[in-house]
Amino acid sequence: MDLNLGKCCGSRSSKKESWRSVLLLAYQSLGVVYGDLSISPLYVFKSTFAEDIQHSETNEEIYGVMSFVFWTLTLVPLLKYVFIVLRADDNGEGGTFALYSLICRHVKVSLLPNRQVSDEALSTYKLEHPPEKNHDSCVKRYLEKHKWLHTALLLLVLLGTCMVIGDGLLTPAISVFSAVSGLELNMSKEHHQYAVIPITCFILVCLFSLQHFGTHRVGFVFAPIVLTWLLCISGIGLYNIIQWNPHIYKALSPTYMFMFLRKTRVSGWMSLGGILLCITGAEAMFADLGHFNYAAIQIAFTFLVYPALILAYMGQAAYLSRHHHSAHAIGFYVSVPKCLHWPVLAVAILASVVGSQAIISGTFSIINQSQSLGCFPRVKVIHTSDKMHGQIYIPEINWMLMILCIAVTIGFRDVKHLGNASGLAVMAVMLVTTCLTSLVIVLCWHKPPILALAFLLFFGSIELLYFSASLTKFREGAWLPILLSLIFMIIMFVWHYTTIKKYEFDLQNKVSLEWLLALGPSLGISRVPGIGLVFTDLTSGIPANFSRFVTNLPAFHRVLVFVCVKSVPVPFVPPAERYLVGRVGPVDHRSYRCIVRYGYRDVHQDVDSFETELVSKLADFIRYDWHKRTQQEDDNARSVQSNESSSESRLAVIGTVAYEIEDNLQPESVSIGFSTVESMEDVIQMAEPAPTATIRRVRFAVEENSYEDEGSTSSAEADAELRSELRDLLAAQEAGTAFILGHSHVKAKQGSSVMKRLAVNFGYNFLRRNCRGPDVALKVPPVSLLEVGMVYVV
């Protein structure tokens, strides 16, 4: 949509175009967001009436279950998600990590290493809410003071992440199995039990095998399939209401819930584990918020998905209230008119595949986010579309999910056990979202704690009721998501814990700048042509792996760049703000530092574009740095020799911006002060890229007292030195680039506890050996790779 439309056509035309775009997004969201939620009528009633309760002539059970389904759909997806949780977005992004990122920006509870104050200057980092009040500052201070709460918060987020992964395994199994189960009405029992499982497994194998092609080629048919399915189930539901029981609307009264529990007692409470499946997929509304927007998801659910689901469930309840002795027990397909059975079966299978595809893609996305925040072992991430952001494929995870999904389908063989397992995973994710949203209400929205407590108690009690009912089915399938989440949580926490310890080891063993400056021919050190990119997690100082490299191979490249690729707690980092560049040592040393910042949903560049852009940023920095030096030298008349011994030995990291070539067109800039490791006050000025005629540049301003001893040189000499430095950079680029990475072996300190030794010596090293190396994550070509062996004692 053209943002200038309103200026050209008037506000009325602009509003019309805006609503047209929102409605289009709402339509497209059907295939991505609501596939899983829309197919739940296939198995809700069948799971609920599996064993715990029986259908009686009085219809109290049917009416009670219908009342529970209606109020659960109304309170959780509609009230909680559509009107509250969707507003807790992180720059338009949703999901567990979005909530965690939002909290970490308002409260210092992040466990991410190499955090810099300069990160707060990012445009996506801005805190738009009013200053904190007394009530939320108390909560903030309490959270920041107790370090164990930081770990507890991370564990809570990891729990939600692990349950999403478990849901990615269970949802395809139960969705496809329930859809294919419609064949039971057209087959004998003997043939049915030998046909459904193979057909389900075949569909699942095809589904996972096609993942590497991406969904962008067939994604345009997802929305029509789900729309057709919603119209189909709502139409059948309306027909059943009119045909069998027009008074089924009475079941919407909450009194039937209490009557149901009073009659069925413990059995009714245990049957809630099947009822909760009606909200399977509701979390996708928040998790996929970044692909659409708040208005589109709200409109699609409120005016289409919600009414269609209510009609579908009411239609099933109306049919079952008049058929107490069905030969095929209770299920979705018994309420479908016989003339529509085969078309509905075909649409149901297609809709189940679409719903499964959405949760599989969501699993890939959340694992990629976990990896970017250092909470998951390195895996290969393939971007399946150059046009659509976020379309990724992870081979290892895909095949693991496929094997486990088929194993679960063959092992459980019925909707009851699959529903018990899926329900527990779904409810655990919702509980995590409720807890994190209550923190957002206090810390980010600055609302009174009593409001957050009311939100937590109201929705938390509903979800705990369902969660407790799911736990009672532990031996009947609910053990699976608990086991899976435990395994994944151990893997993620061990990886994150050891990664933090490695960073602390690097921080303690970094080498001083003086050591680097002392390296020269007198010590037998030679400089070879080319650019050496030394990758490190440190944002200051010289990493120990470089000193080890020089010790074993007394040579390094003519142009040396210490590169730190780091993640910041924002979803995206604008390209104009991604690079922070600075000098390491004096000008003639040709050493630089570059910090590359990515958000947890950013797409990492391939090595060719990264290398080209990095050299471009270095060239821009060199030009502007010499321009600034010349101005300061002309104004202050300070000596270059003094500068080299003092100021240039200080590390200063700067940000990249775009500014106009013309002097009279200066963009608005924001300044933020921060201290480097030498306690020098720097000022970073960052601006948004201009729409036309712009060149990427770097602005770097230093306090005047940092150059007290600097002398002045002539403009001609400065230009000559500038050209010389740029020629050296160009020559080094033509000579080739080498990527220097550490190859780590980690072991626990002597005297460490048994748990720590198991986690570090066996757990982490096993994961490191069997997962992708850092060169794969950074997409480094093997021909340009130099690995330095490092032993970390943590």
Curated annotation (Swiss-Prot):
Q: Which GO cellular component does the record give, naming just one?
A: plasma membrane
Bilayer topology annotation: Multi-pass membrane protein
Query: Cross-referenced Pfam families, in alphabetical order?
Result: K_trans, K_trans_C
Residue ranges, Extracellular side: 43-64, 175-193, 239-265, 316-339, 413-417, 460-476
Has the keyword Hydrolase been applied to this entry? no
What does UniProt note about where in the body, tissue by tissue, this protein is expressed? Slightly detected in roots, stems, leaves and flowers of mature plants and in potassium-starved plants.
Major place of residence: membrane
**Cytoplasmic-side segments:** 1-21, 86-153, 215-217, 287-294, 361-391, 498-794
Q: Which residues form a coiled coil?
A: none
Name the domain of life this protein comes from.
Eukaryota
**What happens upon changing G419R?**
In kup2-1; also named shy3-1 induces a short hypocotyl phenotype and decrease in cell expansion in shoot tissues
MF terms per GO, please? potassium ion transmembrane transporter activity
Instruction: Name the UniProt key words of this record, in alphabetical order.
Output: Cell membrane, Ion transport, Membrane, Potassium, Potassium transport, Transmembrane, Transmembrane helix, Transport
Membrane spanning stretches: 22-42, 65-85, 154-174, 194-214, 218-238, 266-286, 295-315, 340-360, 392-412, 418-438, 439-459, 477-497
Say if the entry is tagged with keyword Cell membrane: yes
Task: Describe what happens without this gene.
Answer: Plants display a short hypocotyl phenotype. Kup2-2, kup2-3 and kup2-7 are considered as null mutants.
Q: Where in the cell is it found?
A: Cell membrane
Q: What does this protein do?
A: Low-affinity potassium transporter. Could mediate the potassium-dependent cell expansion in growing tissues.
Q: Of which family is this protein a member?
A: Belongs to the HAK/KUP transporter (TC 2.A.72.3) family.
List the PANTHER family: OSMOTIC STRESS POTASSIUM TRANSPORTER (PTHR30540), POTASSIUM TRANSPORTER 2 (PTHR30540:SF6)
Full protein name: Potassium transporter 2
Q: Which source organism does the UniProt entry give?
A: Arabidopsis thaliana
Q: What is the lineage of its organism?
A: Eukaryota, Viridiplantae, Streptophyta, Embryophyta, Tracheophyta
This chain is encoded by the gene named POT2
